Amino acid sequence: MLGCNAFPGVQCGHIVDPADAFMFNQINAGNAVAFPFAKGFGWGAEINLRYMFERLFEVAPGGGYPPERVEPEQRNKKILDAVNEVTHRDMVTILKELDPALAKGAVSGSRFQELFFANCKDEKIAEAVRELLAK
């Protein structure tokens, strides 16, 4: 979850149960979730997982919970979004500012390159990776 939240445009929530899922959708209106599959996912886990997905998608995000708190929650979400916009940078900038040896090590595998270049939808990111590999 924390790793996801480090990237621009990602707001990930930790969802343990259906109540978490509902409140994350209503209060945070994020776009990614993390499930603790190694904890509490034994007998009947598929039921809990189904209920969590139902709560995530049963109503439009950002409606607030409780409903009478919608205005301050939406105001706070806008503040958080503005902070994230300033503090999170685009992937091209991140790739250029990381330690080149570290970044190159992350993208130099042949299988990574095969899958990445076949599926990358952002030419600027693809070009940044090519430049990194050429170093």
Give each language-model segment a name:
Residues 22-135:
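C-terminal binding/interaction regions
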Residues 1-12, 16-20:
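Short Gly/Thr/Asp-enriched flexible loops that form oxyanion-binding sites at enzyme active sites
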